[in-house]
Amino acid sequence: MRVEELASVHNDDSHAPPHTLEDATVLQIVPALREEPIARTVLDVASALVQSGARALVAAEEGPLVGELTAFGGEWAPLVNATVNPFRLRRSARTLERLIASEHVDVVHAQSIGGAWIARMAATRIPVRLVTTLLDVPPSGLRGYWAGALARGDWVITPSNFAAAPVMARHKIPIERVTVIPRSIDVAAFDPAAVDAARVEAVQDAWRIMQTARILLVPGRVAPWNGQLILPDVARLLLDSGVRGFVFVLAGEHRSYRKYARAVAKEAEVKGVQAFIRFAGHCRDMPAAFAAADTVVVPAIEAPVFGRAVAQAQAMGRPVVTSDVGVLPEHVAAPPEMPEEVRTGWVAKAGDAGELAHALGEAFALDETAYRTMSERARHFAEYMFSPRSAVAATHAVYGALLARPLADSGERVGSAAKRAEGR
């Protein structure tokens, strides 16, 4: 149901501020309820809220997921927030303020730049706890200015330390107001138990690779920022060290950046490693592609937006060798940040063929028992770090921590807003 249809039921003066999440009303703000990762996460959080006894509202422009939201007991409120037009933002802020008051909203969680501005403006006029979620990659310039609203919540959720560090420094956010919750992946689809042998064989047949070859899967578009140009050097170093029987499979679209793809092929020819590098093109069955691989290689030289390939590979129980840019190192359990006994992969310096080859040499050196153990660790690590269930639980913990505080202690903004509300 739309929130307006329920306003008469919930709009009374008997509302007492809750101290637990089960008694709370939580309003999440996203641009639109379309099938995209952020909206899917919002629905996961809302569904769990309803199951716990809380009331879950989502303010967004209409989309195909509205029906799914209302089917499990969530409520939708129309709200334009995918804008930085100041006039539309002010109008939406007034709409949000009325919604917070009429529905007795306890926590507002803004997950877009426009939504954060709207929530911030509304929260200066009515007391409410405000949670914001940072973007995956820290923006700069004018977009960085607008994105600053995402740093002004009473509690800030960030998908990574990489995303949080510059924002925390710029806006002087204390660490106790920040929680890292990695973006979730579909750990049910990316599950070794869900991929049968026929799917794996189909992928291998499409790649025209012998089943005895050690497949080093390089997922992602063949593009400059993904760093595939280093692979011929890595292949040559491996061959010179006596390693044989491997092939790099570049599983990603390679026509958008033809010049770069040709440069990779030319470098392979110059190094004499053409037979060890295969351009496989776009793969429609990535779980099967990961299952076919022995090791997954992510040689990016620029920070990726999400870094999902590293998470998906580990969910499929595959060791990962990745570069040290952006969020990628945070998505692998590897020394020195983690003990050797919990290792799920290796992190190499971006653009360093020697480090990448050395890491792959260590991966090749694993015996069957050690490989199986690392594979199991990788799967468990992915379930803990990247499952939707983990993301929901961590988000609910943030809501619960805020609700446990007196509203006036949620920040200077909320405290002053509460005083203004009392004086009206």
Where are these regions (language model features)?
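Nucleotide-activated donor-binding/catalytic signature segment of Leloir-type glycosyltransferases, i.e.
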Residues: A261-G281
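A conserved, positively charged/aromatic
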Residues: T124, L130-N161
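Short His-centered aromatic/hydrophobic patch
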Residues: A110-A116
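A conserved mid-protein helix/loop that constitutes part of the nucleotide-sugar donor-binding site
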Residues: E36-D44, R214, R221-L237, R262, ...
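Short hydrophobic beta-strand element within catalytic cores of glycosyltransferases
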Residues: V58, P319-T322, V327-V332, P339
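A short, well-ordered alpha-helix in the C-terminal region of glycosyltransferases
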Residues: E362, T369-M385, A394-A397
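Conserved acidic donor-binding segment of nucleotide-sugar-dependent glycosyltransferases
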Residues: A334-A353, A363-E368
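Carbohydrate-associated surface elements
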Residues: F162, S184
